[in-house]
Design a protein with these regions (language model features):
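C-terminal domain-boundary segment and adjacent tail
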Residues: 32, 60-61, 65, 74-75, ...
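Sec-dependent N-terminal signal peptides of Gram-positive bacterial secreted proteins and lipoproteins
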Residues: 4-25
Length: 262
């Protein structure tokens, strides 16, 4: 009897450990559970020209994305743009939320948070979240520090809590300096995997073209384009919860919080 009880105990522990450390889909019977997912993310917006073009393209493809927006671009008190531009930017953010995209925090002034005081970091993040929530009516759950370096992320993650700090995967298109669409598309298509988080910027025409072209190719390979929120929470059926003290860069092979290579 004792031996049988011991075997049952060991088996129960094995089940629990399997659930904790291996990627388990929410529903093994659903199509989504076997369809590869990737999260396209866009920093530094919104941009009244290119963000609109991107949103139009995403809508045509039934694709979802995550936008890490700069708070200053949404603030009528900001002196960096006209009131009309601010109005248009806010309308774009409202559209993002209405169309099912995730709107996330990318600081207020796009400053280097690693060189800022804790008080400055708190202001940058809190002010931006307030502006986003004022527009969307939704809580801001995710943030990405400008620059996205591992050191910066490590510095701000505890201050940012309960927001979850999100970086990106193992490669960087550096689309802010590269204007070669074909080169960037090839980089994305050749390196993307199920659970990847891709970084681009929605304030460059070439970046928008890159994103949409890459999606067209990846879609033929069976990929579904989801928000960071959906990607990181796809294992909630196993009791998985996000930890604000970690930095999330991929969902590859259950390695949810691996820091990106620098």
């Amino acid at each position: 009897m004792r031996k049988k009880h011991l075997l049952k105990t060991i088996f129960s522990i094995w089940i629990i450990m399997s659930c904790a450390f291996f990627p388990v889909k929410v529903s093994a019977d659903s199509a989504d559970s076997i369809q590869p997912m990737v999260a396209f993310t866009f920093d530094d917006g919104p941009n009244k020209i290119y963000t609109k073009k991107l949103l139009d393209g995403l809508a045509k493809r039934n694709a979802k994305a995550t936008f890490f927006v700069v708070g200053e671009k949404l603030d009528y008190e900001s002196k960096t743009q006209t009131a009309q531009t601010t109005k248009e930017n806010r309308e774009l953010v409202a559209r993002m939320a209405a169309e099912g995209h995730t709107v996330a925090n990318h600081s207020y002034s796009h400053c280097w948070l690693s060189k800022s005081t804790p008080q400055k970091v708190t202001y940058e993040l809190r002010k931006t979240s307030q502006l986003i929530e004022e527009i969307t009516g939704k809580e801001v759950k995710y943030m990405r520090p400008p620059g996205g370096s591992a050191l910066t992320a490590l510095w701000v993650r505890n201050i940012a809590a309960p927001m979850i700090t999100v970086c990106w995967g193992y490669y960087d298109t550096r689309d802010w300096e590269c204007r070669n669409v074909e080169k960037m598309v090839n980089m994305i298509v050749e390196n993307t995997f199920d659970g990847d988080i891709i970084l681009l910027h929605d304030n460059y025409e070439t970046s928008v073209e890159t994103a949409l072209s890459a999606m067209d190719i990846l879609a033929k390979k069976g990929y579904r384009f989801v928000t960071v929120d959906e990607l990181l929470n796809r294992n909630t059926g196993c009791g998985w919860t996000l930890d604000p003290t970690r930095i999330y860069c991929t969902m590859k092979d259950g390695d949810y919080s691996r820091l990106k290579r620098t």
